[in-house]
């Protein structure tokens, strides 16, 4: 199942295996049917972000080969595109900032993205923020805020906190995909009478 087939503009394919006990299986379970994606990447990303998420001229100079952006895996995504797969790989430099990467934010569906990726907007290139990543996993801003607040008890530096939020997003299952799976299970009363 792919997140982009269930309302989230991210190309994130995952295999789901559904097991149903024999004594309650009525044999009519069907995986949810994909539907047309209406949201685009620009609909999910924050409009106003801290300047630290934008690549500076020095960062851009460090990128060895600008032609690498022609390679789909090293592409700068545009606002009408679908995000590549959010993963847990992040880059925090020794100086405490976010490291430059040749994988940034061009056009069309990409096959894979890591959390170092960014967005091209107003001729500026930026990385996804932790909130961007959470939203691309189907979470609401309130969910992100609760997770952020729960991490404040651990005496983390700001960079450690940001790293944890990126990793939590990258390790998550897209909420909308699970929601549609559960709807199909509920349609056939699989969960009726079962204590969860």
Regions from the language model: what does each represent?
Residues 21, 90-92, 132, 140, ...:
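A broadly conserved detector of short glycine/acidic/proline-rich loop/turn motifs that flank catalytic sites
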Residues 89, 139-141, 168-172:
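Short, loop-centered acidic/histidine patches that primarily coordinate divalent metals
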Residues 25, 143-146, 191-194:
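Cytochrome P450 catalytic domain signature, combining two hallmark sequence patches
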Residues 1-93, 98, 102-108:
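Class I S-adenosyl-L-methionine
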Residues 81, 131, 173-177:
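Generic recognition of stable, solvent-exposed alpha-helical segments in well-folded globular domains
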Residues 17-21, 86, 136, 170, ...:
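Conserved proline-anchored active-site loop of SAM-dependent methyltransferases
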Residues 109-160:
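FAD-binding beta-loop-beta segment adjacent to the flavin cofactor pocket
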Residues 162-196:
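Generic C-terminus detector
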């Amino acid at each position: 199942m792919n997140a982009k087939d269930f309302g989230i503009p991210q190309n994130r394919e995952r295999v789901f295996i559904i097991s149903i006990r024999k004594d309650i299986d009525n044999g009519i379970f069907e995986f949810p049917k994909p539907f047309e994606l209406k949201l685009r990447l620009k609909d999910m990303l924050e409009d106003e972000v801290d300047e630290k998420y934008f690549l500076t001229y020095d960062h851009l100079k460090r990128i060895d080969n600008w032609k690498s952006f022609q390679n789909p895996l090293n592409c700068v995504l545009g606002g009408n595109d679908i995000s590549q797969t959010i993963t847990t790989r992040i880059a925090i430099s020794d100086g405490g900032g976010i490291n430059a990467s040749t994988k940034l934010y061009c056009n069309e569906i990409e096959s894979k993205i890591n959390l170092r990726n960014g967005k091209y907007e107003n001729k500026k290139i930026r990385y996804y923020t932790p909130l961007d990543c959470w939203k691309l996993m189907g979470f609401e801003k309130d969910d992100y805020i609760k997770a952020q607040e729960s991490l404040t008890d651990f005496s983390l530096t700001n960079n450690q906190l940001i790293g944890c939020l990126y990793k939590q997003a990258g390790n998550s299952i897209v909420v909308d995909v699970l929601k549609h799976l559960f709807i199909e299970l509920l349609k056939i009363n699989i969960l009726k009478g079962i204590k969860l």
